[in-house]
């Protein structure tokens, strides 16, 4: 098993892994009732994730884990937030097939407020936007290896102090706590009439033993 920088050839598998991993994610499910056609929520989520993968591949840091020649996990990291236009030109415009511009803007604002919880309370200079493991590899230590070993080393080698992130599921929160991450806060966010919890975390940078 190895972690490497993603390439454009990885985009389809990265998009699939993230979409499958986040299909039932409470934060994203808040979108569903307000889409033009709620039954097209999976396609909308795929468009969101394809946009993120393309934007991070082009502008920031996109990593994949390979096992036996297959991509089995994805991590998207940044030390400077990806801007609106970077997202737009990398597929953000596709979201308007599924949602009004107002809904897209509101969802983006809620995401920014969620991230800001970690930013305000943490002491980190890198941010983990997405972490997702292929469903066939869950429970085999891939996520823990990334969170506790690979990503702290990645940040440390770039002179960083720590990385921050948020999650909206209790099971993820337990996973991160057990993986040595520091819980910063638990809050609730709202998109129109929908709400979900947000756990904010940070993890200190640490070089792997050579």
What is the meaning of each model-derived region?
Residues 129-138, 164-174, 191-194:
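Conserved beta-strand-loop-alpha-helix junction that forms the acyl-donor binding cleft
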């Amino acid at each position: 098993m190895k972690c490497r920088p993603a390439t454009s050839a990885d985009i389809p598998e990265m998009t699939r892994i993230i979409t499958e991993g986040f299909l039932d994610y409470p934060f994203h499910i808040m979108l569903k009732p307000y889409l033009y056609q709620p039954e097209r929520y999976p396609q909308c989520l795929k468009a969101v994730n394809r946009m993120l993968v393309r934007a991070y591949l082009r502008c920031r840091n996109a990593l994949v884990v390979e096992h036996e020649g297959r991509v089995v996990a994805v991590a998207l990291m940044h030390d400077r937030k990806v801007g609106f236009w970077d997202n737009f030109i990398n597929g953000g415009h596709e979201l308007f097939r599924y949602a009004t511009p107002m809904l897209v803007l509101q969802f983006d604002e809620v995401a920014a407020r969620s991230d800001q919880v970690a930013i305000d309370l943490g002491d980190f200079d890198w941010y983990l936007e997405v972490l997702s493991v292929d469903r066939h590899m869950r429970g085999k230590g891939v996520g823990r290896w990334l969170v506790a070993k690979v990503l702290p080393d990645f940040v440390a080698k770039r002179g960083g102090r720590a990385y921050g992130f948020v999650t909206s599921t209790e099971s993820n929160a337990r996973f991160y706590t057990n993986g040595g991450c520091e819980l910063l806060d638990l809050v609730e966010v709202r998109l129109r009439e929908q709400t979900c919890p947000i756990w904010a975390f940070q993890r200190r940078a640490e070089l792997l033993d050579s």
